[in-house]
Amino acid sequence: MTMHEFFENFGIKINDSKIFSTALTHNSYANETKTKETYQRLEFLGDAVLQMYVSKFLYLNFTNAPEGKLTKTRSDIVRQETLSEIAKMIDLGKIIRLGQGEIKSKGYEKPSILSDVYEAVTAAIYLDQTEEVLISWIKSTIFKYIEKNDYKELNHDYKSELQEIIQAEIRSDLEYRVESQKHIEKDNKIEYTVSVNLDGKKYGIGTGFSKQEASQNAAKDCLNKLKKSAK
């Protein structure tokens, strides 16, 4: 699939091919081909564009949410993990320009590269297309992902909730431990298993593709068990 064919699937007729090629160019490709520009500057702009439109979406759809809650939710949505999943969802990796070394190491599957290129492409659309086309792109990618996933659940801070309960009981023996980590080959990710311990006993267990995610899931498991034991 060519670059033009890929974007035509989203109703985007490219005007400036150079800016889109730049948005898809990794450092490794630029070094091998002596290309001057890479996606890094566009990534910078794309991050700001996404921040603005996601902020507007949250402001208009969560009219009673306080500023802190909106900020946390936005961070959950525009983080690397989420953006890389969106890039995978639309097969963006297939058109990224990588050097041979990155191709061999499957750079087209790496979350850091995928999320950066998604931001860079968003910037290219912002510069090359109308706002209507840009909004259509954002709706069909990042907002589509939001609709498929319970991001309200992602926004809930189980660790803070558990900490508040422990503090209310005047206890300070809450501890999180990394029990194990393993490489998930098909996803090219590290899955962590974290336990939460109270009074030296394991009360919750959780897994995730980051220590933070696994800790949140462990805290959620612990909260569920504490609530059941309180009945």
Curated annotation (Swiss-Prot):
Primary site of residence: cytoplasm
UniProt GO cellular component terms: cytoplasm
GO biological process, one term: rRNA processing
Enzyme class, UniProt record, top EC level: hydrolase
One function term, GO molecular function aspect: rRNA binding
Pfam families reported for this sequence: dsrm, Ribonucleas_3_3
Domain of life, per lineage: Bacteria
Domain DRBM: from-to ranges: 157-228
Active site feature: 47, 119
Catalytic activity field: Endonucleolytic cleavage to 5'-phosphomonoester
Subcellular location: Cytoplasm
Cofactor or coenzyme needed: Mg(2+)
Signal peptide: none
Domain RNase III residue range list: 3-130
UniProt-listed Enzyme Commission number(s): 3.1.26.3
Sequence positions that bind Mg(2+): 43, 116, 119
Keywords: Cytoplasm, Endonuclease, Hydrolase, Magnesium, Metal-binding, mRNA processing, Nuclease, RNA-binding, rRNA processing, rRNA-binding, tRNA processing
Subunit-level organization: Homodimer.
Family named by the database record: Belongs to the ribonuclease III family.
Function of the molecule: Digests double-stranded RNA. Involved in the processing of primary rRNA transcript to yield the immediate precursors to the large and small rRNAs (23S and 16S). Processes some mRNAs, and tRNAs when they are encoded in the rRNA operon. Processes pre-crRNA and tracrRNA of type II CRISPR loci if present in the organism.
Protein name, per record: Ribonuclease 3
